[in-house]
Amino acid sequence: MTDQNETQDTNPVTTRRGVRSFVLRQGRMTEGQKKAFDRNWAKYGLSRDNGMIDPREVFGRDNMLNLEIGFGMGKSLADMAEAAPEQDFIGVEVHLPGVGALLKEVESRGLENVRVYSIDANDVIDLCLPDACLDRVMVFFPDPWHKKKHHKRRLIQPEFVQRIRHKLRVGGILHLATDWENYAEHMLEVMSASEGFANTQEQGGYSPKPDDRPITKFEKRGESLGHGVWDLLFYRTN
């Protein structure tokens, strides 16, 4: 049986130095997650060792390709993949319990249109995905790093957005969502100033929640407490 700590020791989560947008928590996979991981990683898992992939070869077809960065426990990604079998989905998550949970969902639902990386999204972008291969990139509820001294750790930064841009086809969508108002304002400021992107909202500002973005249990809980959620949808113009 695969040992999760050994997996990330022999295949480091990131090759990048400097500020990280994530902290590796010490949580361990449950027995069910470990078993799902061991049964399914060979089929659904991707790694840096695969190098620059050809999505058409990975999925055996040339369909709409989505990338979700930081899928958490994976239920929303599984919901989207199940609801859109004609689309393909690549998920990225550094926390192995989430990877195990997603693989359990993928197996139980019989999904064939999902593949998974368990490394830093920066490495996936730089080392694994060819330019202009993605139709949509989704970053839902990333860590807001709410203390001002930690804002530099926020994933959505001008340099990161430009690297995402090159992986999107022209017309492709970058969809961001957060339940932290200050981060929403930061995202809108970054995206509005980003070369090669335009807001899908003609008047600028935030977007209504698209029907195909699942509502998470945390989002439902937040809504019941009166918390807001902000969606931003920008498309690549050039």
From Swiss-Prot:
<dbReference type="GO" id="GO:0043527">
    <property type="term" value="C:tRNA methyltransferase complex"/>
</dbReference>
<feature type="binding site">
    <location>
        <position position="68"/>
    </location>
    <ligand>
        <name>S-adenosyl-L-methionine</name>
    </ligand>
</feature>
<dbReference type="InterPro" id="IPR055361">
    <property type="entry name" value="tRNA_methyltr_TrmB_bact"/>
</dbReference>
<comment type="function">
    <text>Catalyzes the formation of N(7)-methylguanine at position 46 (m7G46) in tRNA.</text>
</comment>
<dbReference type="Pfam" id="PF02390">
    <property type="entry name" value="Methyltransf_4"/>
</dbReference>
<keyword id="KW-0808">Transferase</keyword>
<dbReference type="InterPro" id="IPR029063">
    <property type="entry name" value="SAM-dependent_MTases_sf"/>
</dbReference>
<comment type="similarity">
    <text>Belongs to the class I-like SAM-binding methyltransferase superfamily. TrmB family.</text>
</comment>
<keyword id="KW-0489">Methyltransferase</keyword>
<dbReference type="InterPro" id="IPR003358">
    <property type="entry name" value="tRNA_(Gua-N-7)_MeTrfase_Trmb"/>
</dbReference>
<feature type="binding site">
    <location>
        <position position="147"/>
    </location>
    <ligand>
        <name>substrate</name>
    </ligand>
</feature>
<keyword id="KW-0819">tRNA processing</keyword>
<comment type="pathway">
    <text>tRNA modification; N(7)-methylguanine-tRNA biosynthesis.</text>
</comment>
<feature type="active site">
    <location>
        <position position="143"/>
    </location>
</feature>
<dbReference type="GO" id="GO:0008176">
    <property type="term" value="F:tRNA (guanine(46)-N7)-methyltransferase activity"/>
</dbReference>
<feature type="binding site">
    <location>
        <position position="143"/>
    </location>
    <ligand>
        <name>S-adenosyl-L-methionine</name>
    </ligand>
</feature>
<feature type="binding site">
    <location>
        <position position="120"/>
    </location>
    <ligand>
        <name>S-adenosyl-L-methionine</name>
    </ligand>
</feature>
<feature type="binding site">
    <location>
        <position position="179"/>
    </location>
    <ligand>
        <name>substrate</name>
    </ligand>
</feature>
<feature type="binding site">
    <location>
        <position position="93"/>
    </location>
    <ligand>
        <name>S-adenosyl-L-methionine</name>
    </ligand>
</feature>
<keyword id="KW-0949">S-adenosyl-L-methionine</keyword>
<feature type="binding site">
    <location>
        <begin position="216"/>
        <end position="219"/>
    </location>
    <ligand>
        <name>substrate</name>
    </ligand>
</feature>
<protein>
    <recommendedName>
        <fullName>tRNA (guanine-N(7)-)-methyltransferase</fullName>
        <ecNumber>2.1.1.33</ecNumber>
    </recommendedName>
</protein>
